Amino acid sequence: MGGSRGGMDEQNLVLLNIDHVQQKHTWDCGLACIMMVLQPHERELLSLKLFQICEEEGVDKSTWTIDLAYLLHRFGIKHRYVTVTLGVDPGFSSERFYSTVLNKDHQRVLERFQKASKQGVVVEQGGVALSEILSHLCHQMPIILLTNAHLLVCEKCARTMPHLRSCLPCSPPYQGHYILLIGCDMKKNLIYYRNPSFSSRVCYITFSRLDEARQSYGTDEDVIFVYSQFETQVTL
């Protein structure tokens, strides 16, 4: 980690040099994103003791963004979690994606939100403009983002594998999926990200399509700003 800061006016292209981590299960995409921003020894610890740490955190094969914020705090990673809903949107009960986890997770998630401030977990209510996301990336810091995978259309994947509509094909209207934003191209209006459902590769998406995927109902527009600077890389 390291590197100098730069503003949006100074950098048209930013691409952070962050090691890729592929998820091992259907439910741990957010945990894989956490691993990507950890130091190597911390990443190894979380990987080796994943189920033990999940048990200690009260996570049972379903992670919410508040859980990721608590994990970042556990590993001493400065962060800021922004969401439009402090708690659980009651409307999620009608969403197929949440139907199997809402009952078991509802109370636990509410309690984590209520205790966040005292625990040192930074949570703010509100929406995030694309300009704020771009500014953060231009300062060489990554972002953990909740998206609707059904709308996550990678331009690179669409060109090389045109039969794929999105990076994570699925049939339900909403399929929650975490990705790690690692850069942007201001001239081409692209955001670079790592998708933990794939093996190591850098995906990219247009600004407008990213907004569509991250602001889809079901995401609560959840954004975690990670305040750790990384070196930049020259090529994809």
Explain the meaning of each model-derived region.
Residues 1-4, 136-142, 148-236:
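Noncatalytic regulatory segments and standalone regulatory/sensor domains
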Residues 2-3, 10-14, 44-47, 107-112, ...:
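Generic detector of short, locally flexible boundary/turn motifs and exposed helical patches
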Residues 1-89, 97, 135:
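Active-site nucleophile-adjacent alpha helix/oxyanion-hole segment immediately C-terminal to the catalytic cysteine
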Residues 68-175, 224:
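Predominantly the structural core of cysteine protease catalytic domains
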Residues 45, 124-128, 205:
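Short coil/turn linker and secondary-structure boundary residues
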Residues 30, 64, 129, 206-209:
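Alpha-helical structural motif
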Residues 44, 51-52, 59-60, 93-95, ...:
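Charge-rich, low-complexity amphipathic helices
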